[in-house]
Curated annotation (Swiss-Prot):
This is Cytochrome b-c1 complex subunit 7. InterPro entries: QCR7, QCR7_sf. The modification N-acetylalanine is found at residue 2. The modification N6-acetyllysine is found at residues 19, 78, 83, 88, 96. Its main location: mitochondrion. One of its GO terms (cellular component) is respiratory chain complex III. The keyword Membrane applies. It is found in: Mitochondrion inner membrane. Belongs to the UQCRB/QCR7 family.
Amino acid sequence: MAGRPAVSASSRWLEGIRKWYYNAAGFNKLGLMRDDTIHENDDVKEAIRRLPENLYNDRVFRIKRALDLSMRQQILPKEQWTKYEEDKSYLEPYLKEVIRERKEREEWAKK
């Protein structure tokens, strides 16, 4: 039982570091989400192609708005920043599926 509070305290500390880094990265000040900043390789491009239309349109809007703000060297008002708690990984399920399918194709190609 003595170890339990230490785990809880360390996980709270780690969560605090995550929130600090999230805000320090700065993409949230432009209204972007984490998944909007992923480097686009072939797997990511395919995952983006598979997004439902509403998620895809939201992503395009956030990226265009961020580019516009960046060109004008501005950031959004603080109340419009993407909050750590609200940042959902919308691309991850699609990306995992694409990677799984690619690995499966590679396995079949080996045989």
